[in-house]
């Protein structure tokens, strides 16, 4: 097993800064492009990350630590952000994400006072029994997944424009 709480927190702390540096100030063309029908653009990915910060990671962690595996924690609607109207700029969304993430990391540090708690078990509504360690590992991998998704979606915008170089661009082969 590779999980290390300190290292996990490093990634979770850096994600908001990474996204802010990469996305702030970009034109709407970059922020609104997607990979086709039923896929998310960059703004929607950020909205999803905000939704997950509010309703997924810390609420589930608290539920596991309070309830254990006797009762399944509430499901998380991964598509909830698509049903909300947003007029916020990308900078406003990134600021909101950063603020909630920093609060969540403070809460994480308060909740996980010792390594033994990483083995606490809860009941996922689909997967059954899960450990805190797995939830936190998923949080990190989720960040990395969506950073990769944003980069891939943005590269897709220029697929036709790169001409024959497409052959050398691995990101366009996914």
Where are these regions (language model features)?
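Alpha-helical bundle segments that constitute or directly flank the non-heme di-iron/ferroxidase center
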Residues: 2-30, 51-63
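Amphipathic, non-membrane alpha-helical segments in soluble helical-bundle scaffolds
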Residues: 2-12, 39, 43, 90-94, ...
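Acidic/histidine-rich alpha-helical segments that form the ligand environment
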Residues: 78-119, 134-142, 149
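Short acidic/polar alpha-helix capping motifs at helix-coil junctions
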Residues: 8-11, 23-25, 68-71, 85-87, ...
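Hydrophobic faces of stable alpha-helices that mediate helix-helix packing
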Residues: 12-16, 54, 101, 108, ...
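Basic/polar N-terminal segments that are highly enriched at the extreme N-terminus
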Residues: 1-3, 173-174
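Short, contiguous alpha-helical
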Residues: 32-76, 122-174
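Charged/polar positions within long, soluble alpha-helices
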Residues: 21-24, 28, 62, 66, ...
